[in-house]
Amino acid sequence: MRNPGGSLPHTLPRALQHAGRTGVVEQPGRWAPERTAGGDRSEDRLPRGGGASAAAAAAAAAASGALLGAYLERHGLPAASDLPAPAGALAGGPGSGGGVVVGVAEVRNWRCCCLGSTCWCRSLVLVCVLAALCFASLALVRRYLQHLLLWVESLDSLLGVLLFVVGFIVVSFPCGWGYIVLNVAAGYLYGFVLGMGLMVVGVLIGTFIAHVVCKRLLTAWVAARIQNSDKLSAVIRVVEGGSGLKVVALARLTPIPFGLQNAVFSITDVPLPSYLMASSAGLLPTQLLNSYLGTTLRTMEDVIAEQSLSGYFVFCLQIVISIGLMFYVVHRAQVELNAAIVACEMELKTSLVKGNQSDPSGSSFYNKRTLTFSGGGINIV
């Protein structure tokens, strides 16, 4: 006959686990199953096997209860951490005797780390793909760009300047492209000083013409395109405020396309002379960097002709410094622009709460025609 005490190490943890799960640890003498809703105890109910099996089950339960009581009186209650976890329970869960937060927090932290590493890997892959596309495009059109630059260089000086001015006018419209290419080409062909002067004059003329044309003919088209962009809508609202010129200058340093910025600012009520001055001031840092980059590309031909290792090193260092400085300027401009947008919107909300929107003084900031977009009202002229 099997000794009933041999099953005690298996019976005891399960019984104590049940007691710890319900939150109540009873005394050994009072250890008894719960009563049912009808008031009968669970061992009084007859199982399907009949009365004989019920009597055997009752005797086994009584023997186990006696052994359990004797064991508890001698050794005491075990610690909660020694109890086995139920099937499917996490470490640190309710059935293991520990805190439920520990296991769940570990799983969540692991998942967040995995997601963060996945996002980082995706960003790295995207940067590599974009870099590969840029180098491939440069390799494909390098010969054509070289022939084009040589053709422009062979032209008369005045004709070449007029050609650059026409190019800056074209890229100043919303659908134009190639603003940075023209800047680098001007520095490449005319040097740092003359190329810089050509850039300033050409961009000023192109900005003026694009502003007037978009304001007279393309206001509805520009407003329809802006309504789906929260960032451009916020820029317009801030430009309509008191710090509009600062926002215009900061926006010129952001990666927003040059022609698109001209179209966006054309539907505001910023005075044209002030707008041109703020645009020129905002574009000046990137123009300096692009002109210097074009001048560096001019020196690349001398480096290749000399086949000097130190020349290659200096050229690569100049390129890296120029690109890094450009990224830093753009990043700082984005931070300042976002701060200006937040500050102006908070000021606008405060003024609306105070009732300044009905100011009879005729302030141009509140007495404008308003277009209702999906993201809110955008003031335009």
From Swiss-Prot:
Pfam families noted in UniProt: VTT_dom
Which superkingdom? Answer: Eukaryota
Q: Which GO terms describe its cellular component?
A: endoplasmic reticulum; membrane
TM segments? 52-72, 85-105, 121-141, 161-181, 189-209, 310-330
Q: Enumerate the InterPro entries for this protein.
A: TVP38/TMEM64 (IPR053069), VTT_dom (IPR032816)
Q: Name one GO biological process term.
A: positive regulation of fat cell differentiation
This chain's protein is named: Transmembrane protein 64
What organism is this sequence from? Answer: Mus musculus (Mouse)
Sorted alphabetically, the keyword list is: Endoplasmic reticulum, Membrane, Transmembrane, Transmembrane helix
Where is it located?
Membrane; Endoplasmic reticulum
